[in-house]
């Protein structure tokens, strides 16, 4: 199958990292970008320089109102209304919706009016079907025009939860994600009417926050529906987060048995999705890691054979953006079958 042509709506953190991933891994061909808040020259600058992932490894320039990357021409639009973006004209059959604004089927479907065939929302959705690579792609329905890639945290938790649940059975569990700062947070204390704590200075605080990531696992693994919930701590780091899953198991297992099962899955059916390490790692060691989830064998503990705490890392930008592309490519293959 030839490379799938894609468009990116919203050239923020995820939009730009999706683009970088498409170049590094050569998985998809970005033919168009839309962002009404960034002019072309600023787009070049933001793509070229990144405080977390470094300088872009390639040639970036502009010509005739288009972005030129490694000699390839990419159409650039600045439409606020997604229905006005000429995706079809640009040849973008699949669109990554990464603004964080158009996260429902109704809103994201506006891209279809512009000529896109399918839309992947790079965020959880209230009504679009959610897919997590390595977990529930077998449930993909080609009739769906709009789907969600869930959240970065769900992409970390779900593969690990699947391995544990399939082998040992999860009776119930609580998840905590220690999550890096994101763009919605404040540099200094500022107004945040819906989340007072979320308005406090990101660099100065550990901020408790809500997350639907654990509950969302129940949507992609129906047998876990109602068995998991969780919360988050936002911490003063710029990238890489870590999931702590504390679970009660149906079938008793030693921690060594759990480690062995996760390692087995990481080398087989979840290779490339779930990683495994026994090294004495810290968060910076995972910047640029393309796995959805990397199990930290040395960090977990068990109280007894039925009650365990499991730890798994994730680059919440790079790994997640990789999965956006993987999902698009999977959809394109299924849609053309």
UniProtKB/Swiss-Prot annotation:
Keywords: Cytoplasm, Glycolysis, NAD, Oxidoreductase. It is found in: Cytoplasm. GO terms for molecular function: glyceraldehyde-3-phosphate dehydrogenase (NAD+) (phosphorylating) activity; NAD binding; NADP binding. It comes from the Eukaryota. SUPFAM superfamilies: Glyceraldehyde-3-phosphate dehydrogenase-like, C-terminal domain, NAD(P)-binding Rossmann-fold domains. It catalyses: D-glyceraldehyde 3-phosphate + phosphate + NAD(+) = (2R)-3-phospho-glyceroyl phosphate + NADH + H(+). Pathway: Carbohydrate degradation; glycolysis; pyruvate from D-glyceraldehyde 3-phosphate: step 1/5. Its EC number is 1.2.1.12. NCBIfam families: GAPDH-I. This is Glyceraldehyde-3-phosphate dehydrogenase. The lineage of its organism: Eukaryota, Fungi, Dikarya, Basidiomycota, Ustilaginomycotina. The gene is GAPD.
